[in-house]
């Protein structure tokens, strides 16, 4: 690698020096700006003074970028003149290889880079690891043919992925339509409404502290685990026994309890703790335990319905971190038909949503296969299989 690429990395101006950032006009890239494509925008900008007093360096448009921290192997090609922080490596000089050829070669090497990552809470790689890689360097015309064929195949794949993503969006719309229709019935019938606080046995906010995470221990939920209608524990997080006990002093969460995200990017999503699961609450969430006159799934579906979405929009506070207060949620009105009608409504909703979920699983499988296909295309390309 060192024979064909000279790697460099950027830096971060001192955060406490406002003159390094205020009214800055130099795009300063962080890993979140990398998009596995051409990067034309940055979340942050720095000033000339910030540039001079840090390790950040101006790099030209057309430069290859590779993430070294966290999202290891995330790529980009600069579409603008900019600088980066130290978490991003950039190709200062390429010898005998084109930028696009190296871009796709590094994309093929992503899984290997991830496996070479080291660290505690966040795995990282270094420039030393990048320099240790071997790279195949065919003649320029072969490189051009490879890039052309890869992009041709990726273009076909992108069209299929776009169709799948559109299907997912349509399924999301259908979900909301099912919930809207189910609860509109009660509006038309003028079914009595009650404040949520009046028909729940317990409504408990989460502890207002960041838990100390550990590799193994008791399960502690984050709002990133929340999906409408269920918990996604594919990426679990754990805390120690003592932290767990401390976080359940207000109320021990039980299977069947309704969880609701009330802050941040994942705002307004309700799910239920499934049977056999012992958990404590992380941050930005609350717990609702229904009484005998309220079906917990009826409450969950109502919290996920368009009716509550509109109420949340009216009551939302904060811009950088949107949130809704527990006190406001307690005052939310919910139609309360008799328990038998609630049970029937839940059955109808879940019968219709089960079809939706089946299709969504098929779509997700196809999307995963598309990602695998990209890697297969890259692997074959650099082994001479697609040209």
Positions of PLM-derived features:
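Interdomain signal-transducing alpha-helices
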Residues: 102, 143-146, 299, 303, ...
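Short, ligand-facing micro-motifs at secondary-structure edges
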Residues: 11-16, 33-46, 55, 64-84, ...
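Low-complexity, Lys/Gly-biased intrinsically disordered segments
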Residues: 1-36, 52-54, 192-231, 244-248
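Non-catalytic DNA-recognition/assembly elements of restriction-modification systems
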Residues: 1-11, 132-147, 155-156, 166-167, ...
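A short glycine-rich beta-alpha junction/loop motif
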Residues: 68-71, 82-89, 100, 119-141, ...
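Short, well-ordered loop/turn sites that connect or cap secondary structure elements
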Residues: 59, 247, 252-253
């Amino acid at each position: 690698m060192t024979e064909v690429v000279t790697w460099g990395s950027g830096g971060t101006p001192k955060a406490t020096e406002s003159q390094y950032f205020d009214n800055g006009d130099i795009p300063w890239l962080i890993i979140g700006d990398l998009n596995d494509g051409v990067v034309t925008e940055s979340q942050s900008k720095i000033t000339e003074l910030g540039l001079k007093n840090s390790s950040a360096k101006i790099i030209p448009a057309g430069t290859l970028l590779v993430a070294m921290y966290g999202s290891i192997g995330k790529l980009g090609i600069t579409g603008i003149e900019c600088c980066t922080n130290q978490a991003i490596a950039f190709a200062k000089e390429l010898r005998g290889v084109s930028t696009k050829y190296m871009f796709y070669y590094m994309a093929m090497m992503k899984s290997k880079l991830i496996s070479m990552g080291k660290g505690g809470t966040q795995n990282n790689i270094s420039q030393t690891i990048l320099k240790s890689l071997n790279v195949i360097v065919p003649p320029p015309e072969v490189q051009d043919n490879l890039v052309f064929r890869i992009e041709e195949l990726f273009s076909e794949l992108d069209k299929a992925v776009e169709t799948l993503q559109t299907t997912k969006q349509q399924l999301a719309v259908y979900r909301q339509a099912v919930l809207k229709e189910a609860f509109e019935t009660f509006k038309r019938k003028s079914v009595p409404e009650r404040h949520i606080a009046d028909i729940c046995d317990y409504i408990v906010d989460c502890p207002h502290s960041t838990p100390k995470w550990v590799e193994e221990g008791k399960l502690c939920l984050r709002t990133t685990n929340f999906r409408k209608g269920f918990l996604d524990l594919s990426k679990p997080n754990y805390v120690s026994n003592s932290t767990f006990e401390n976080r359940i002093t207000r109320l021990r969460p039980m299977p069947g309890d309704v969880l609701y995200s009330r802050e941040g990017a994942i705002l307004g999503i309700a799910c239920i703790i499934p049977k056999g699961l012992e958990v404590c609450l992380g941050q930005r969430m609350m717990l609702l335990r229904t009484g005998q006159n309220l079906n917990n799934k009826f409450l969950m579906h109502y919290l996920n319905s368009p009716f509550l979405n509109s109420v949340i929009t009216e009551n939302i506070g904060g811009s950088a971190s949107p949130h809704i207060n527990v006190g406001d949620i307690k005052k939310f009105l919910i139609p309360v038909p008799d328990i038998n009608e609630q049970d029937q409504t839940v059955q109808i909703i879940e019968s219709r949503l089960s079809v939706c979920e089946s299709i969504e699983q098929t779509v997700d499988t196809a999307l995963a296969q598309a990602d695998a296909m990209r890697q297969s295309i890259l692997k074959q390309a650099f082994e001479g299989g697609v040209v």
